[in-house]
Curated annotation (Swiss-Prot):
The lineage of its organism: Bacteria, Pseudomonadati, Pseudomonadota, Gammaproteobacteria, Pseudomonadales. Substrate binds at R103, T136, R137, K138, R160, K170, E199, D220, S243, G244, G245, I264, G265, T266. Involved in the catabolism of quinolinic acid (QA). This is Nicotinate-nucleotide pyrophosphorylase [carboxylating]. The keyword Thylakoid does not apply. Pathway: Cofactor biosynthesis; NAD(+) biosynthesis; nicotinate D-ribonucleotide from quinolinate: step 1/1. GO terms for molecular function: nicotinate-nucleotide diphosphorylase (carboxylating) activity. InterPro entries: Aldolase_TIM, NadC, NadC/ModD, Nicotinate_pribotase-like_C, Quinolinate_PRibosylTase_N_sf, Quinolinate_PRibosylTrfase_C, Quinolinate_PRibosylTrfase_N. Its EC number is 2.4.2.19.
């Protein structure tokens, strides 16, 4: 599946920010009203740790919606690796607006940069191999597209976006349809042209999936030896995706079996936010 780009996300970004501001600002920022509305200020945002940045567009949109007079000047790009205490961006505008938008802007940036940083770490572990690391649907509710974009900033790739853009036929689907061949045939009938992926648990099921014409076969917790056999058996007839039992210790060995993809839920579901700080100057 193709990776998301910012061009795909403009409406999503606006909606994400509207939701964030509605839950944080509500009917108005009480504390900001203590400040003279004519008071101008500047601010600098830094990172306190090593990170890979993602989320600039969400920060820009926060301040656009809070007060379009706020000027945001970036010192880094999405996908850029940064060092502790490095300045990420500067703000200039009404002090009230800077303080009202601060938390929402940093929430987006720290979360999405956390996703990008974890993705970059995993991508570094398989550097030099041909494998592509994929995200999953294990995302934060309401922020799937944002997190999937952040994954690409860290050098990994997008799997299907949701249940609507590709088939992923798993054990229960196969049982309900009466077999792998029937499930694939029905998928082709329902949505010709949509990618069809089938999850298998052994080499016999792999053979069935290949004979039925699957586009992608997910190898669920196969041993390294079985993965190597699967690569030889498939011989390019379908793409192979490894899934299950994957961690930092096993990732490189799995990549070196020759599979095309490795899907990793932890890229988006176990995110640790990057530590950021904003300092205001009046």
């Amino acid at each position: 599946m193709p990776n998301l780009t910012l061009a795909d996300l403009q409406g999503e970004i606006q909606a994400n920010v509207r939701t964030a501001l509605a839950e944080d600002v509500g009917g108005g920022d009480l504390t900001a009203q203590l400040i003279d509305p004519q008071r101008e200020a500047e601010a600098r945002v830094i990172t306190r740790e090593h990170a890979t940045i993602a989320g600039r567009a969400w920060v820009d949109e926060v301040f656009r919606q809070v007060d379009p007079r706020v000027l945001v000047t970036w010192q880094v790009e999405d996908g850029q690796r940064v060092e502790p205490n490095q300045m990420l961006f500067q703000l200039k505008g009404p002090a009230r607006a800077l303080l009202t938008g601060e938390r929402s802007a940093l929430n987006f940036l720290q979360l999405l940069s956390g996703t990008a940083t974890r993705s970059q770490h995993y991508a570094d572990l398989v550097a030099g191999t041909a494998v592509k690391l994929l995200d999953t649907r294990k995302t934060l509710p309401g922020l799937r597209l944002a997190q999937k974009y952040a994954v690409t900033c860290g050098g990994c790739h997008n799997h299907r976006i949701g249940l609507y853009d590709a088939f992923l036929i798993k054990e229960n689907h196969i049982a309900a349809c009466g077999g792998i061949d029937r499930a694939i045939a029905e998928a082709r009938r329902i949505a010709p042209g949509k990618p069809v992926e089938v999850e298998v648990e052994n080499l016999d099921e792999l053979r069935q999936a290949l004979e039925a014409g699957a586009d992608i076969v997910m190898l669920d917790e196969l041993s390294l030896d079985d993965m190597r056999t699967a690569v030889a058996l498939t011989a390019g007839r379908a793409k192979l995706e490894a899934s299950g039992g994957i961690n930092e210790g096993t990732l490189r060995n799995i990549a070196e079996t020759g599979v095309d993809y490795i899907s990793i839920g932890t890229l988006t579901k176990d995110v640790r936010a990057v530590d950021l700080s904003m300092r205001l100057t009046l």
